[in-house]
Design a protein with these regions (language model features):
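Generic alpha-helical segment signature
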Residues: 31, 134-138, 334, 338-345, ...
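Short amphipathic alpha-helical coiled-coil/interface segments
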Residues: 137, 141-145, 345, 349, ...
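ATP-hydrolysis module of ASCE/P-loop NTPase motor domains
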Residues: 90-97, 116-192, 308-311, 317-321
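Conserved aromatic-histidine-acidic binding/catalytic patches
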Residues: 26, 53, 57, 93, ...
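SF2 helicase catalytic motif II
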Residues: 392-398
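Conserved ATP-driven helicase/translocase motor core recognized via long
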Residues: 51, 177-362, 377
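P-loop NTPase Walker
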Residues: 1-117, 244, 355, 359-373, ...
Length: 399
């Protein structure tokens, strides 16, 4: 007899007409809930197994999940051998869409790549396109990047010259190559590459007057705020714990509390801006001497905690090494170089894509981007193909 579901699991099985996230530890039964939810549709509502798109993260997981669904179906047929609808599912389980995102995108492209049209050089992706493995893609990227850099050096702009000089390019191109490939990797992670590139250009064309208004400043201030709060809480809890030890309470606890108050002040100042936070001084003096016999095991633990928080605060000094005006000036000085880097990466990306099209090949990122183009129009609305594909499925489940 199947193991009974918990109340929370049963609620996840029964929920309808809304998106649902099941979050739990590994091995707690999330896949089991998915299988039970799937069969709740089949048994209660007359659905078929191939009415659903079920996404997994690896091909092995997809195969394993199909096996679990087939096993669950067999168990149900044994309990109800006369159920014709269940017998039909034995045929459907092997044609149900249980696959990875990559496999889904590949199938979608092979069926509909004619809708993408040709690129600027007249190359179109054909249904028999080949998916490059990572080694092939890397070799091709390196070849295309070498040609791209040759043309970059032949037509250097002032920004390009600053970029090359800053990275020591010309003598050793490895730093520039690595930077272009790193930015290209980030570009490939964006659903709309051109829009992302234009957003980066817009930032560097008009750097804000305050560093806290830049993405970098916001990230750094949030990091300082989070770490200051964490260290403050650690020190305050430690001071409270040291009340149980007279020697530590007398020698260590006051310093812990003083540092925690300074960290609390820093946490508050991060909301006021860069320079306000930069102006907060936090002292971590040498702790007073405490005999091991008086401090016991707690002494070593508290000393370690103090040293860890002290190291964290040292990192704040590095972050706030420059004032807001100085940091903004540094960004503006590098703006032309950054714009040149963005344009260089965009040129490399275009050439790389054209070379893949010429070879009738695609990498994993291409499949996802082209699938988005097929399913979502330039205005952000679903395409006709999107509506057709959507109509195939009653629900999308992700394991």
């Amino acid at each position: 007899m199947a193991e009974k579901l918990t109340n929370e699991q049963q609620a996840a099985v029964d929920s309808r007409e809304r998106s649902l996230l099941v979050s739990a530890a590994a091995g707690s039964g999330k896949t089991k809930v998915l299988v039970e939810r799937l069969f709740s549709y089949v048994e209660r509502e007359g659905a078929n197994l191939d009415d659903f798109l079920i996404i997994t993260y690896t091909r092995a997981a997809a195969s394993e999940l199909r096996g679990k669904i087939a096993k669950a179906l067999t168990e149900r047929m044994e309990r109800d051998p006369g159920n014709y609808h269940l017998r039909q599912q034995m045929l459907r389980v092997y044609r149900a869409d249980i696959k990875t995102v990559d496999a889904f995108c590949t199938a979608l492209l092979r069926e509909n790549c004619h809708l993408l049209g040709e690129d600027a050089r007249g190359h179109a992706l054909r249904p028999d396109f080949r998916v490059l493995d990572e080694n092939e893609a890397q070799v091709l990227r390196e070849r295309v990047l070498a040609r791209t850099l040759d043309d970059f050096y032949d037509c250097l702009t002032p920004g390009g010259t600053l970029l090359a000089d800053t990275l020591g390019a010309g003598r050793d191109d490895s730093a520039l190559e690595d930077l272009v490939l790193e930015l290209h990797a980030k570009l490939q992670a964006q659903p709309y590459e051109d829009k992302w590139l234009e957003a980066q250009r817009a930032f560097w064309r008009a750097v804000p007057d305050k560093i806290e208004d830049t993405p970098y400043g916001k990230i750094l201030l949030n990091e300082v705020r989070r770490k200051a709060r964490h260290c403050k809480n650690l020190l305050q809890r430690a001071a409270q714990e040291m009340c149980a030890n007279d020697a530590l309470n007398q020698k260590y606890a006051p310093a812990f509390l003083d540092a925690s108050y300074q960290l609390e002040a820093l946490e508050g100042k991060t909301a006021e801006g860069w320079d306000a936070a930069r102006g907060v001084t936090i002292a971590f003096p040498r702790l007073a001497a405490v005999k091991d016999s008086d401090g016991g095991e707690m002494k070593a633990r508290m000393k370690s905690l103090w040293d860890n928080c002290k190291e964290t605060v040292k990192g704040f000094a590095e972050i706030f090494s420059a004032s807001s005006d100085e940091a903004v000036e540094d960004l503006r000085t590098m703006a032309s170089a950054m714009l040149a880097l963005i344009d260089l990466t965009a040129d490399f990306s275009r050439r790389y894509n054209e070379e893949k099209r010429r070879r009738n090949s695609a990498d994993f990122s291409d499949q996802e981007h082209e699938a988005i183009r097929l399913l979502i129009g330039e205005d952000g609305a679903p395409t006709e193909l999107s509506r057709i594909v959507s109509a195939r499925y009653r629900e999308i489940m992700v394991d």
